Swiss-Prot record:
Plastid as UniProt keyword: yes
Name recorded for this polypeptide: Small ribosomal subunit protein bS18c
One example GO MF annotation: small ribosomal subunit rRNA binding
InterPro entries in the record: Ribosomal_bS18 (IPR001648), Ribosomal_bS18_CS (IPR018275), Ribosomal_bS18_sf (IPR036870)
One record GO biological process: translation
C-alpha cells in the first residue's frame, strides 16, 4: 500500500512563454490635417463645405475618406440630411 509520491509537475509539459521584444524607439504619431478649418461651421446652409463631402452619385462619403473625426462626421451627416430635406441638395443625382 505504500506508493511512492510522484511529483505533480512531472506529468505536465513546461509552458514556454514568448516574450515581446522591447521596442527601441517609439513610432512617430501621424496627425492628419482636418479638411475643415477652424473658421468653417458645419451647417446645412454652408453648401460650399457640404458639397466637398458628397460623392458624384450624391452619397455621403465615409469618415475614412473624408478624414473627419467621428464627431465632425456625425455633424456633417446631419447637416447633409437637413439640406436634403429642405431641398437645398438633391437626394439623387441624374446619371445624364
Amino acid at each position: 500500500m505504500d506508493k511512492p509520491k510522484q511529483s505533480f509537475r512531472r506529468h505536465f509539459k513546461p509552458i514556454r512563454r514568448r516574450f515581446k521584444p522591447i521596442r527601441r524607439y517609439l513610432k512617430p504619431i501621424r496627425r492628419h490635417l482636418s479638411p475643415i478649418r477652424s473658421g468653417d461651421r458645419i451647417d446645412y446652409k454652408n453648401m460650399s463645405l457640404i458639397s466637398r463631402f458628397i460623392s458624384e452619385q450624391g452619397k455621403i462619403l465615409s469618415g475614412r475618406v473624408n478624414r473627419l473625426t467621428s464627431k465632425q462626421q456625425r455633424l456633417m451627416t446631419n447637416a447633409i440630411k437637413r439640406a436634403r430635406i429642405l431641398s437645398l441638395l438633391p437626394f439623387l443625382y441624374n446619371e445624364n
